[in-house]
Amino acid sequence: MNANPKFLSADAHVDAAAVAPLPNSRKVYVTGSQPDIRVPMREITQADTPTGFGGEKNPPIYVYDTSGPYTDPDAKIDIRAGLPALRQGWIEARGDTEVLPGLSSQYGLERAADPATADLRFPGLHRHPRRAQPGKNVTQMHYARQGIITPEMEYIAIRENQRRAEYIESLKSSGPNGAKLAAMMGRQHPGQAFGAAAFGANALAEITPEFVRDEVARGRAIIPANINHPESEPMIIGRNFLVKINANIGNSAVTSSIGEEVDKMTWAIRWGGDTVMDLSTGKHIHETREWIIRNSPVPIGTVPIYQALEKVNGKAEDLTWEIFRDTLIEQAEQGVDYFTIHAGVRLQYVPLTANRMTGIVSRGGSIMAKWCLAHHKESFLYEHFEEICEIMKAYDVSFSLGDGLRPGSIYDANDEAQLGELKTLGELTQIAWKHDVQVMIEGPGHVPMQLIKENMDLQLDWCKEAPFYTLGPLTTDIAPGYDHITSGIGAAMIGWFGTAMLCYVTPKEHLGLPNKDDVKEGIITYKLAAHAADLAKGHPGAQVRDNALSKARFEFRWEDQFNIGLDPDKAREFHDETLPKDSAKVAHFCSMCGPHFCSMKITQDVREFAAQQGVSETEALKKGMEVKAVEFVKTGAEIYHRQ
């Protein structure tokens, strides 16, 4: 997209690649108890099994869909107008918010009055911001603790279930072998959940709205849903739900425009980003964020200290509580769903980093450490934490308590500074919960595999099971350019142990700002890690997609293999590099083994022979061996023959 500001406002558009439906997929909606609860899912159509393999019907499978209206051909996409306000009616019906006459942050008012920003501003519908009425608390946690099941909670329950029960029923009615097929496709290995909800191997275990409410009330899950982001589709972050992933985007002082960041957001959610963090540190942070939020169907997170630092020209020592407070209100009124706040970086912990290999690597952590040292005072984030809670509960902004002292190398993993901060984050969690403010805890970082579980166990203990949100962790430091892999290994492990959301890492980590291709690579890598964790935990229905793809692979349904996978485009591209013809899409082999050495084709031949002989597959193999033994003796019982 052209970076020219005038072009942006006049002709801004979404990338065509981000709105095209995925192959053999369509957007479907499942309606809840009221007509305006319409939960999106992606339906993947499958071909029938070839006659030679049984000829049964393969019903569509349903997968979690984060792409919002962008992949719905019936939706009118205009990023200048933004997305429909999906939750507006639910928010209004609760009767506990008020519409403000205008912006109440000083900086927001200044930007709105500045003629230099006119061409950069979001041109769509300008709703006045909402805030809780005096004395009211509008957080999803508050409602949950009052015993209220909100529409958001019902929406989430439907979304997490992914129509598993309907899929199994459709298998049962697919033909004479339907019951057998349903049992096979619904089979799932028991998981090891490390104290999380024990669903076992029950693929049909249902996530109910009441279960969602209870998990939020306990603080074990959060629903990031600012009342000023009504465009968002409700989702949940907690270890008893599907593991989620976050994608980071954002401009810097040296690269990227507003248009490019909107493109990255729509691209990230196409491939499975459950939330997006705008980490912009360059020009026009306020305007960039407005465009992103108004066009985002997923929760948006930020690190407010980044923008506060820009307001004091990059001088950390000039930061004040008043500037930071105004920044929180500014962003809350725009609709940011969760704030990363590094309130655990206390003055007493800063000296503990002196002997580290890589010091303080968190931007937010280093900003607050510098402020503490410059003033030799306790962090104003820590000192004013209760006041921050008052702001959060007025808009339902969730805390993402930042790990400002996370290790930046495996050398520094699990050291005194990191664990001291984690203990403080646990204390702050208890304070936030007194205000019914939702909390998740950020985690490392760089941690070798043998130390990962200790991180998870300490977090569960000290933070009382508040959701854990980790960056990786990276399990080795030797692979610049491949840190999506070094971190994907750690992400799969810590997701299995109980982490609720994984922050993606792209191949550009430590090297540069990611482009769209890097964003996709990071997303797919982390979707894979999250799914592997769901399988290992034994999450209900986690294996359905694996079973469907494996069946398609065994039956040489190549198109279904591509389409059920996380990245149909890459799978098709790799296959077509060596077998590009359409005939290869129905062939009973690939270029790996060729037509004569395909193990799956050989297995099919054994099954066909068994069916012809009216014997079991084991007996068929035995008969085949006997025939070959007779042939061996008749030809002279020689191992080798001259040609």
Curated annotation (Swiss-Prot):
Disulfide pattern: none
The processes (GO biological process) annotated in the record are: thiamine biosynthetic process; thiamine diphosphate biosynthetic process
Carries keyword Transmembrane helix? no
**GO CC, any one term:** cytosol
| Co-factor: note | Binds 1 [4Fe-4S] cluster per subunit. The cluster is coordinated with 3 cysteines and an exchangeable S-adenosyl-L-methionine.
Q: Does the keyword Lyase apply?
A: yes
Per its Swiss-Prot or TrEMBL entry, what cofactor is needed? Answer: [4Fe-4S] cluster
Q: Which reactions appear under catalytic activity for this entry?
A: 5-amino-1-(5-phospho-beta-D-ribosyl)imidazole + S-adenosyl-L-methionine = 4-amino-2-methyl-5-(phosphooxymethyl)pyrimidine + CO + 5'-deoxyadenosine + formate + L-methionine + 3 H(+)
EC number(s) per entry:
4.1.99.17
GO terms assigned for molecular function? 4 iron, 4 sulfur cluster binding; carbon-carbon lyase activity; zinc ion binding
Q: Where does Zn(2+) bind?
A: 446, 510
* Entry binding sites for substrate: 248, 277, 306, 342, 362-364, 403-406, 442, 469
EC main class here is: lyase
Give the residues the record marks as binding [4Fe-4S] cluster.
590, 593, 598
What the protein does comes down to: Catalyzes the synthesis of the hydroxymethylpyrimidine phosphate (HMP-P) moiety of thiamine from aminoimidazole ribotide (AIR) in a radical S-adenosyl-L-methionine (SAM)-dependent reaction.
- UniProt cross-references to NCBIfam families, sorted A to Z: PRK09284.1, PRK13352.1, thiC
By sequence similarity, the record places it as follows: Belongs to the ThiC family.
Quaternary data: Homodimer.
Question: Would you tell me the protein name for this molecule?
Answer: Phosphomethylpyrimidine synthase
